[in-house]
A protein has these predicted regions:
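Conserved N-terminal phosphate-binding loop of PLP-dependent enzymes in the Aspartate aminotransferase
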Residues: 1-162
């Protein structure tokens, strides 16, 4: 929501909140929060001591440990490399996304390109018939992004030769 200038009255959080340990949370502005009484809203994994301890560590890393700086830096590199590939390969219709959630839309079905990448050590997943998603770990390195883009580049060349 922050990338679009939206400020929600409430938001649900889960999944990555505790680094893979099951947890859930709901945050709300005062006006909305006042509508809830104890027991109105619950989460199976919302507040046990182990999960909340893990969540505290994750929040510390996100806010104070420099992790978000790495996400920004590597996201910019990923975007740059995908745009370079778009200029190089006519089968890339569009490169889109921001941060470490990005994708390319191809003019051909993405399945063969994805399979080629997987066969060469790059695990990818599609999003629909013609889109390849890139959602690397938040700790991804510059070397890993460049290696991934090099594998993708070769797979795109092979797809264009068909």
């Amino acid at each position: 929501y922050q990338a679009y200038g939206v400020e929600p009255d409430g938001a649900c959080f889960a999944k990555g909140l505790a680094g893979g340990v099951p947890i859930g949370a709901f945050m709300a502005k005062d006006k909305l929060a006042q509508a809830f009484k104890p027991g109105d809203h619950a989460s199976t994994f919302g507040g046990n001591p182990f999960a909340t301890s893990c969540g505290t560590v994750v929040m510390h890393e996100l806010l104070d440990g420099g992790l978000l700086d790495n996400v920004k830096k590597q996201g910019e590199l990923l975007s740059k490399r995908l745009m370079e590939l778009k200029q190089k390969h006519s089968i890339i219709k569009e490169a889109r996304g921001f941060g470490l959630i990005q994708g390319i839309e191809l003019t051909i079905p993405a399945g063969d390109v994805i399979a080629d990448c997987i066969n060469n050590g790059l695990l990818l997943v599609g999003a629909g018939a013609n889109v390849i998603r890139f959602v690397p770990a938040l700790i991804v390195t510059e070397k890993e992004i460049n290696e991934a883009m090099d594998i993708l580049d070769k797979a795109l060349f092979r797809a264009e030769e068909k």
